[in-house]
């Protein structure tokens, strides 16, 4: 079975990319157990709780990330450099447990996947 990586690199609520990526991730989890989630660049904002998408007339899908464990999606990485660049602390309580990785280590980890889907 192919190893699949889902990379979230866009901020939530500005486009439908994050919501569509999450939908694709949950659907793919029914077909394979070998998938991992990466949060890089502005995608790190997908991990923050307390967002108010109704202010921009968007649907609040961020809470759905909390369901990843129910779908047996347990491997989540977040780019430590992306967190620093955006003034976020790796100790921030995220909506899912994501392990910080430096950019070089994250690239090496991504190289282990057969398919990389970016949202």
UniProtKB/Swiss-Prot annotation:
Compartments where found: Cytoplasm
Main localization is cytoplasm
- InterPro entries hit by this protein: DsrEFH-like, Sulphur_relay_DsrE/F-like, Sulphur_relay_TusC, Sulphur_relay_TusC/DsrF
Cellular component aspect of the GO annotation:
cytoplasm
Name the Gene3D superfamilies on file.
Answer: DsrEFH-like (3.40.1260.10)
Origin, by domain of life?
Bacteria
Q: Which SUPFAM superfamilies match?
A: DsrEFH-like
Gene Ontology BP terms? tRNA processing
Query: Which is an annotated Pfam family here?
Result: DsrE
Q: Which UniProt keywords apply?
A: Cytoplasm, tRNA processing
Q: Which PANTHER family match?
A: PROTEIN TUSC
Instruction: Name the job this protein performs.
Output: Part of a sulfur-relay system required for 2-thiolation of 5-methylaminomethyl-2-thiouridine (mnm(5)s(2)U) at tRNA wobble positions.
Return the similarity comment: Belongs to the DsrF/TusC family.
Spell out the subunit comment.
Answer: Heterohexamer, formed by a dimer of trimers. The hexameric TusBCD complex contains 2 copies each of TusB, TusC and TusD. The TusBCD complex interacts with TusE.
Q: What name does UniProt use for this protein?
A: Protein TusC
Q: Which organism is it from?
A: Escherichia coli O139:H28 (strain E24377A / ETEC)
């Amino acid at each position: 079975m192919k190893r699949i990586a889902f990379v979230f690199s866009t901020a939530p609520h500005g486009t439908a990319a994050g919501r569509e990526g999450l939908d694709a991730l949950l659907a793919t989890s029914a077909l394979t157990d070998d998938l991992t989630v990466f949060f890089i660049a502005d995608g790190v904002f997908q991990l923050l709780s307390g967002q108010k998408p109704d202010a921009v007339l968007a649907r609040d899908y961020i809470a759905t990330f909390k369901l990843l464990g129910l779908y047996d999606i347990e491997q989540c990485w977040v780019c430590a450099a992306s967190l620093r660049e955006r003034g976020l602390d790796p100790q921030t309580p995220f909506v899912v447990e994501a392990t910080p990785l430096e950019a070089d280590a994250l690239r090496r980890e991504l190289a282990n996947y057969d398919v990389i889907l970016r949202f």
